Amino acid sequence: MEKLILPRTNAIRAGLSLPTLSDLTDVVTHPPLTQEATAEPFEYPRDNWGSRIALIGPCSLDSPVSETPDWLASIDRPIVLVSTSSERQNDTALVTATIQALRDEPVHVVASVPTGVPAALAAPNTTVRQFISHAAVLERAVCAVTHGGMGVTQKALSHGVPVCAVPYGRDQFEVARRVEVSGSGTRLPSKKMTPNRLRAKINQARSMTAGARRVAEGFRRAGGAARGAELAERLLSRNAHPGPAAAPKSS
């Protein structure tokens, strides 16, 4: 990827009379401020980033939950949320496996399938929809089964809900690893997924609420979008009102 992107990036920079980059990491380490939408303990401890990189935590776009939908209010069991990618990556099997894994468990599965709900997804203790308010469900969830997407995984952890991450590709493998390392849930590679293995990983994750709450507290302390805006405004204000130039030295 670096061989593909770096020459094109440097060509754009040359047209703007900017110095060339020797490494793609320069993209985030050279600017006066880079904001990362995560925070410790979900982010690994770093001691070499300096003040240019700010961990501000997740920036949720969800509206506050004003009232619980009737279908959600009617569920009287602990809820396990399962969510798949909004990109087509053939991960509907995650919903199918979760339904099979928890068919005889005293829980209710709420699944969101943004790419479209297959007709075959049905079970007595299951609600499947194309789109749902994750925030409303997470207020009552005891576990979230995710494809390892950074958005839904951090959203669950922001609510203190432990995660069972089943990654399929790209950054999802790293997100799932962070779930495991932070003690906020479990990881199960999709290629090794069976209903029995998934059930075991979900039940293990359900015992890790304390770890999920630690991550939630770390996110809360980071400040989110409000702190990000404050840092950006501070930088812009400093650049708009630079300090007085040094007086010339007398000869």
Where are these regions (language model features)?
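Acidic, glycine-centered active-site loop in nucleotide-sugar glycosyltransferases
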Residues: 124, 159-160, 180-185
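Nucleotide-activated donor-binding/catalytic signature segment of Leloir-type glycosyltransferases, i.e.
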Residues: 113-132
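Acidic, amphipathic alpha-helical patches
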Residues: 24, 134, 198
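C-terminal amphipathic helix plus adjacent low-complexity
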Residues: 195-251
